[in-house]
Amino acid sequence: MMKKTALCALLLAMAITPAAIATTTLSLEGAYVEARSAQVFIGGCVWNSEAVTIGREAIMAWRIEKGQIDGIDVTGFSVVAAIAGEANLAMEPDAPRRTVLYVDEMANKVQREALAELYTNRNARMFGNVIDVVATPISFVDTAEGYSVRAGREVELTATALHIDHKSFEQCGDAQWYEPFVPLQDSTLGVTVEHSYQGSALDAQWSDPNTQSAFLGRFSF
């Protein structure tokens, strides 16, 4: 069962500044997957028709395989963000958007607060207004060719690597139109098997499976 926490109030009260973030000692690495409601690899005509009207929703997920924040061990935990904006999230990076941040309920209070503070501030522009921080069960597992993520009953994202037949794609004028939302190592284009948000906090729900709208990779910072 999901539990709303006092993390949102805590983060607002702390009013963390960029200088404070810079003095935080941290080291995190692990697996990452994201998907948005716009195809990242598609023909130019389709991309042009989608660019203004969609791409306003996204899910981002991190699995921390090794990590510490100011000496707090956060190894083994996952963090997921569900984002809904008023415009294409990539093309209009300063357009208003709202985010629900999910933090692994297996973490203790100190660990959850450290994760929420770090991810909220590192992704401040991408997240926009973080309207809720929720402690919930998070599953982030490897599949045969990608990752599968669940955050409580509200978020599901499964993506597999996109295998590109360049000759057939070139005939259709397909190309990559977007980059991942965050810096990655070994970034791979992906296809969503499932991509959905069914919560109520964002005043928007979506389901966008079977599209070339994902990125998979490794992160470290």
Where are these regions (language model features)?
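Bacterial N-terminal signal peptides that target proteins for export
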Residues: M1-A9
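Context-gated lysine
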Residues: K3-K4, K66, K109, K167
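Bacterial N-terminal signal peptides
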Residues: C8-T17
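Acidic/polar, glycine-anchored loop/turn motif associated with catalytic or activation segments
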Residues: A20
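N-terminal Sec/ER secretory leader and immediately downstream segment
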Residues: T23-V103
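Mature, soluble, non-transmembrane domains
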Residues: Y102-F219
